[in-house]
């Protein structure tokens, strides 16, 4: 690990990414400063030199901030396993993992996403899981029945989660899904009603 002014180290990491200096960026991956490690990850990604091993190590970093940055990058790649990150003790990391899995359309993660959507204590994690499940609902080889059951169930959750669920339910042809979207026209949350109205072509208040 390096010492010194963390601000200077962060600047070095950012500049390394823009200059294509892999050696400089790599030397800062283990810096004591969290922000520098994040910047070094981004720099190597920008250069195109971030290896699978680099990313795997970052996903195990002691800082949740670095783990989140690694997941943001992993959302665009398929060479690292990120399913376990759904169980991270830091809710912000778990939320980002759900986002990344949705971006990667990883159908094998459906059971874990369903569990998160139903049971996670953090509302943002539940919302991210519902958004990911909605994205996965359109993928060929996926357990659509499990996704449908979950989306119907979370229509009793907070407004921001119901909004996500309505978007997912609209992708199903099953009668219960159509009924739920229709029912959302009378939701107590105005934005939920508006989303349902936009999807159905109905004017709402």
Give short role names for the model-derived ranges:
Residues 2-19, 27, 35-49, 54-57, ...:
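Structural detector for internal amphipathic alpha-helices that build alpha-solenoid repeat scaffolds
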Residues 185-188:
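TPR/TPR-like (Sel1-like) alpha-helical repeat modules
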Residues 21, 65, 92, 110, ...:
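HEAT/HEAT-like alpha-solenoid repeats
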């Amino acid at each position: 690990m390096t010492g010194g002014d963390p601000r200077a180290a962060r600047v070095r990491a950012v500049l390394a990414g823009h200059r294509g200096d892999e050696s400089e960026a790599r030397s800062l991956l283990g810096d004591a400063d969290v922000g520098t490690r994040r910047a070094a990850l981004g720099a190597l990604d920008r250069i195109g030199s971030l290896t699978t091993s680099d990313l795997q190590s970052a996903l195990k970093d002691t800082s949740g901030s670095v783990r989140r940055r690694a997941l943001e990058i992993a959302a665009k790649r398929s060479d690292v396993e990120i399913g376990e990150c759904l169980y991270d003790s830091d809710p912000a990391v778990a939320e980002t993992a759900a986002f990344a899995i949705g971006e990667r359309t990883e159908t094998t993660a459906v059971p874990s996403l369903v569990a998160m959507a139903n049971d996670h204590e953090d509302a943002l994690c539940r919302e991210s899981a519902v958004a990911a499940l909605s994205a996965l609902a359109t993928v060929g080889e996926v357990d659509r029945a499990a996704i449908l059951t979950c989306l119907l169930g979370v229509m009793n959750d907070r407004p921001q989660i119901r909004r996500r669920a309505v978007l997912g339910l609209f992708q199903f042809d099953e009668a219960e899904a159509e009924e739920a979207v229709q029912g959302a026209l009378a939701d107590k949350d105005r934005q939920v009603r508006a989303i349902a109205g936009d999807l159905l072509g109905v004017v709402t208040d």
